[in-house]
């Protein structure tokens, strides 16, 4: 990095004044070096802090001013020296010799000045000619620049000089004519309404040379953009338009710059309607009002042939509704030579390589270059096929094309920062670090994106991918979005008869190809359809669920024999996978293509897998059994049924059997397909928690001064009835899911409406806020839970997720007064702990960041209340005033030996540790009952700790979480 680059990096972003001041400080030589060293690297640096491409206009003015000042100083010094010499000569020579000497010196000085100015002009012209073609600013040409161009061209017309093509130092000329069409076209991947600056500058040149003003040109452009009725509106991109090279040889600088122009053209490309309508008008305007210089006979013949080809292709495109760009793929002029691109195509920029192409990262794009060593005919067909298909596609899970070059066979694609799915283990960690298999939940989440992309290809565009495999799917490391790539051998469904030849049957990877592609029989040609991708999808799903290459160490013939004999499961076992996934993969592997499901059916099956409880081996269960609230009717039906559901709860419950019998007949219009939301409103999620998570199930008596009481006894009774109804609904849902969908939906809507305005007790609110903090939904502006956060909650908190992790917690949840959050390790508690649960309620937390600390949110009876309970068996034990709530931190010294430590006490079981801490609890209770505050201070390290998460950021510091004794 030179000194100039260091100075550029120091400047702040958008600080144009500082940049101009920096250039002014440079000497003339430094400025000249600046112009000589401006390449992609310095342009990148300048673009970073100015957020715009490099502009040489104002730099050229600085160089010109400084060079004039330096030359003036040198000339003044020479004049002074000459004057001194002349004075000395005047003493000796006579008047005649003096006059002769002065005239000669003046002539020399004038000639020297003229030569110096001519050299300066030549140098400036060389610099302008060399870099003017390189710079493509992202903003349109300003009025002052347009006036300068018009003035220059008017002077040339007055002198009757033809417009000379732009030349660089290598002698390559660039013609501004629109008669030749090249491969640099405007893709329809973006919908920008601006033309590229090269198009505007070329149109200005043609208009100004023909005598048109800038206003008339702009009006013609606007009028032409509206007259697009006669232009084909095919899904392909607009017609190509660029400046073509007049010779096949050019400098490496120009070749690199051509690729840079290809990349920059993406930000200023036109829409389909505007570009397609503007192109014929510009060509017509150029032909009518700007006649080219008289060409030679060879040029006339070439132009006539090219015009005939263009006319024939335009007629064919109008008849077949195909864009002219598709027909002109093989007839483009030389844009990028075949050699001298070592700066781009080197190993340091390579990010991927396949059998037929290599991918390089260059200027923020992915440059796909087909290998020149392969057969040109096959590669050209694959190249044209991929370009033709990519320009028709527009889906968030399919890679987007920027532009391409037919001569170099280069395709510029959007860059995706991530790896392919064949490197899946490095991107997705399993649920347990000791497990050798991935988390099926994560795999299914990712594969839903692939299914959406394939539904778009099959049903909306009509394309068969033919090469669906993990290496052709990229995963963005930033947003986890999947992108489908590599459409070189893809086919259109309506051209099966033309494309399904013997060569196409052998295409694709044999590990993922179906049997009908591996058998070269003419009878199988009719069987090649969309089911080819379904078979590959099943193999790919198995690979990502097992992290194992299918048919590893087997040859093509062996794999072919296995697939034709239908012995796949002997090599690709499925028994260890959840049953729903087993059935789906077996359907995708059917030998008969007509039996294989479509991707729409696959999507519905994946949704059912998500909504059902799917146990796997080793006690691991994934996803959520209680996520049935995601299955709902349309929003309009939900809104219309809200009021009815509130008033007709009993009626709906009594008519459950009738609804179950009439699901398929009477209620077809009310049921809809399964809907998986991208985000869940917090209100629905809170209702879901209250209905399905049994948090502290001991009921509280009415007490107006306690934060635990509900509004009244009736609301408490309704809550109990509602909870019992929810339990019955869950059992019905788990046992009769397919028969009770409508009943569950109605009851779930009832629960949402009944609980929407309900006041939860303090423990409910505490757990809600704790979960809300974990899900990072604290901000009031962000009142939704995303799917990723929802899955994180289920992975960390749901008792249905873990292996031995939640076995003991599942037992605890059946005991009133206990609910546990156990995140990382296994806790096995003794039977004495269960006995202790009848008197003490617990909320168990394990810190996700520190698994060696266990937090117990305890609710223990006070000493006075315990004496009353021993004497009288009444309902006073439910009075919150007789209980005290506190939190203790327990240190887990050794999980294997079950060593629990707290406040200097150690035990091999958690129940034993609590028994040892019971005297401290009793002393604290008695101190609180007497109103003493000394016990709080003495036990500050043991009780009343603001954890977990500092009591949810001290949100309810006034005691709304706990009873009045807690402060």
Swiss-Prot record:
InterPro entries in UniProt: Kinase-like_dom_sf, Prot_kinase_dom, Ser/Thr_Kinases-Pseudokinases
Catalyzed reactions: L-seryl-[protein] + ATP = O-phospho-L-seryl-[protein] + ADP + H(+); L-threonyl-[protein] + ATP = O-phospho-L-threonyl-[protein] + ADP + H(+)
Pfam families, per database record: Pkinase
Region (Disordered): 65-122, 215-251, 287-326, 634-667, 700-752, 862-882
Keywords: ATP-binding, Kinase, Nucleotide-binding, Serine/threonine-protein kinase, Transferase
Superkingdom: Eukaryota
PANTHER family named among the record's database cross-references: INACTIVE PROTEIN TYROSINE KINASE PTKL (PTHR44329:SF140), SERINE/THREONINE-PROTEIN KINASE TNNI3K-RELATED (PTHR44329)
Protein known as: Probable serine/threonine-protein kinase DDB_G0290621
Gene source species: Dictyostelium discoideum (Social amoeba)
